Amino acid sequence: ETDIEIMMSVDLGIDLGTASVLVYVKGKGVVLKEPSVVAFDRDTNVIKAIGEEARLMLGRTPGNIIAVRPLRQGVISDYTVTEKMIKYFVQKALGKRTFKKPRISICVPSGVTEVEKKAVEEATFAAGAREVHLIEEPVAAAIGAGIDISKPCGNMIVDIGGGTSDIAVISLGGTVVNTSLKIAGDDFDEAIVRYMRKKHNLLIGERTAEDIKIKIGTTYPLIEDETLEVRGRNLVTGLPKTVTETSTCLLYTSDA
């Protein structure tokens, strides 16, 4: 590589999450945030949509179109699809500018194995990166929150993602102790799906469950209860059904 090619390159930061992908361009900030979802034709294996467009297909696609999330619990479950998804998001973030291959820093959960780290690194190189640097999610979260991680004092970081929850104590620029739990946002969504089925005989999809969580989900009782109309399919009659749910009731979804 020549010095000119390197100067024409660009630095990217990617938060490769189970639920969503964020892309940061140095000097510009976060330029992209989209769901980690890919839709493809079951018969031809051709990708039909990636990101937000694919998310809208979750649970609502015709029989031959499948919408999948290529990462599960923070790690790659489908290497080829993940590679194509990263490449798509990188190209979308950079647009039609004539940058050479970018240098990419990409987040990984703190508890992943060396093999899982290698898979992320290789997928990012295959997607067109010139250099790849892996950074543990709690460290990235601390820096993003404005914490000076170089100081000789401990800061506990709790990063709840879609597939994993990372907890770490950071001091003097490094991780003192950390753990990664495979319980996170996706599990909350699944608990809401079970709860709606058990309480209302109502079948809802992942997308609806996530909307419920975002709009009225809470971990403690609110002074004023919030309500939301939820649409789904009646499991008894098979017909569309609408129910009204409250934020207080959702406190007990984990019991469903």
Spans of features found by a protein language model:
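Nucleotide/phosphate-binding catalytic cleft detector across ATP-hydrolyzing
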Residues: E1-I160, A168-S254
